[in-house]
């Protein structure tokens, strides 16, 4: 505490001037409720060194502090010196905090930086409620590290390749009729997400028709015509087919524009971006070097594995028999690439849902076995799912709660409640809209961040905007009431 630091320094000065004694062993604690005071000095550790009674030491230090510091009075209880701090000190402290725009921030304490990964969405649909929790956790961690004096790199890896984006592309080719986000007045990510939903609808219908024709359910799911076309498109993309790559770039571009709008509204940002299309081939060189050093081994079919059974984990494939990479290969390469890009990185934090807990245990252990010293400072910021009262979100069925829709709902809910309370008289429409946004998004952020990340959340929009209880709305309302009282008083703070 700030006050304890000041009192500690005052006590050290008192000991030096009264007893000619220097020490850093000064034990302070908050005064117990049953006694009068704000801060308590535990005197017993000083008795042996000063060769005086606890009462005599307490009186001399207490008298000195009353004469030379912000202490206005003291009392002694069985070797505990209880100190009462002057009200003027707190007023002075509050004023200094008000004038210090960076109160609570530390200067940069080292040249070692932290990289924090968060968001990392797929490019086939808009961000949803789960992404909101991810972004708020990752961004908050970044700001906390900054305040603690660390240099921070905020990054994400965008999952911009694979069968999921090909599904949206196939559906757009079949049913898009040349439409664009601009022509339909839709955000780009929402526009592309609608075609992902369309693909799933067509896919399910084709599966049903195949089953009716006598094909087994498993065969139908694997051989639905639209799915086979999406798989073929992925092969074309990987071979660099010009038309496929151009469409891929165009549709991903629409999605990125939509993402940026969502990030802006949520109040988060990034310093750098990594794309899976650039990183999915990274890591192979480390698999080959790991083979030579004995970290990995090759099975008869040619696939490469890491045996982690002695570490309490399972065997993990790191390269397929056909030589293609798996996600673990990519993550190994991406981690190394990030350190190359930012050599001052000492710590990396991955903000990813708890369904990936095992993946990160394996990743961190493999990087350690490969001999990367920075692997000791890798951390998985794991978090639980977010549900709404209506149930778990499912993007393929079009029942996902989009982040944009939820933020708009929060603003609308705040508007409804604020109007019912009748506290906005005299404000312009712009000022009212600013209040609605501040209250609504503040409620969303606080409701999510107040919960232990490891716990699953049942998010209730109306409950989060309640002006009673442990909510952002209550805190904001309390702040506004305090400001109103101060404005009506003669005290200037």
Put a short name on every predicted segment:
Residues 16, 21-41, 45, 53-491:
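NTP-dependent nucleotidyl-transfer catalytic core
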Residues 1-21:
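Generic start-of-chain signal for non-secretory N-termini
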Residues 50:
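Phosphate-backbone binding interfaces of nucleic-acid-interacting proteins
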Residues 1, 491-493:
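Accessible peptide chain termini
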């Amino acid at each position: 505490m700030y006050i304890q630091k000041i009192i500690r320094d005052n006590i050290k000065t008192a000991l030096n001037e009264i007893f000619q004694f220097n020490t850093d062993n000064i034990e302070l604690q908050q005064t117990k409720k049953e006694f009068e005071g704000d801060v308590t000095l535990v005197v017993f550790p000083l008795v042996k060194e000063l060769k005086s009674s606890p009462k005599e030491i307490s009186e001399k230090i207490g008298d000195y502090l009353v004469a030379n510091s912000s202490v206005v009075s003291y009392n002694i209880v069985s070797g505990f010196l209880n100190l009462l701090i002057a009200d003027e000190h707190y007023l002075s402290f509050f004023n200094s905090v008000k004038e210090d725009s960076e109160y609570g921030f530390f200067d940069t304490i080292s040249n070692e930086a932290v990289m924090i990964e968060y968001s990392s969405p797929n490019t086939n649909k808009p961000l949803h409620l789960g992404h909101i929790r991810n972004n708020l956790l990752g961004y908050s961690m970044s700001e906390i590290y900054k305040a603690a004096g660390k240099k921070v790199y905020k990054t994400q890896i965008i999952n911009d390749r694979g069968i999921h984006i090909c599904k949206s592309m196939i559906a757009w080719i079949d049913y898009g009729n040349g439409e664009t986000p601009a022509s339909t007045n839709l955000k780009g990510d929402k526009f592309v997400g609608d075609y992902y939903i369309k693909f799933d609808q067509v896919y399910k219908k084709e599966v049903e028709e195949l089953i009716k024709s006598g094909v087994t359910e498993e065969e139908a799911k694997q051989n639905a015509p639209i799915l086979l076309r999406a798989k073929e498109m992925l092969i074309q993309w990987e071979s660099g087919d010009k038309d496929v790559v151009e469409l891929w770039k165009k549709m991903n571009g629409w999605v990125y524009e939509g993402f940026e709008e969502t990030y802006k509204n949520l109040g988060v940002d990034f310093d750098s971006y990594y794309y899976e299309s650039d990183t999915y081939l990274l890591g192979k060189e480390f698999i080959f070097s790991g083979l030579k050093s004995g970290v990995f081994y090759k099975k008869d079919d040619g696939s490469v594995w890491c045996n982690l059974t002695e570490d309490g984990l399972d065997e993990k494939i790191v390269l397929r028999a056909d030589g293609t990479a798996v996600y673990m290969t990519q993550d190994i390469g991406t981690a190394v690439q990030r350190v190359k890009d930012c050599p001052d990185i000492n710590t990396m934090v991955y903000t990813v849902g708890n369904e990936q807990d095992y993946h990160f245990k394996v990743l961190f252990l493999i990087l350690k076995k490969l001999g990367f010293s920075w692997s000791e400072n890798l951390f998985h910021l794991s978090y639980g799912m977010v549900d709404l009262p209506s149930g778990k979100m499912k993007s393929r069925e079009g029942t996902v709660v989009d982040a944009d829709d939820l933020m708009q709902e929060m603003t609308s809910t705040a508007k409804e409640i604020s109007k019912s309370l009748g506290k906005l008289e005299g404000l312009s429409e712009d000022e009212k809209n600013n209040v609605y946004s501040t209250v609504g998004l503040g409620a969303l952020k606080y409701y999510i961040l107040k919960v232990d990340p490891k716990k699953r959340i049942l998010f209730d929009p109306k409950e989060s905007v309640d002006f009673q209880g442990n909510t952002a709305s209550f805190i904001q309302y309390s702040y506004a009431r305090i400001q109103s009282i101060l404005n009506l008083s003669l005290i200037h703070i």
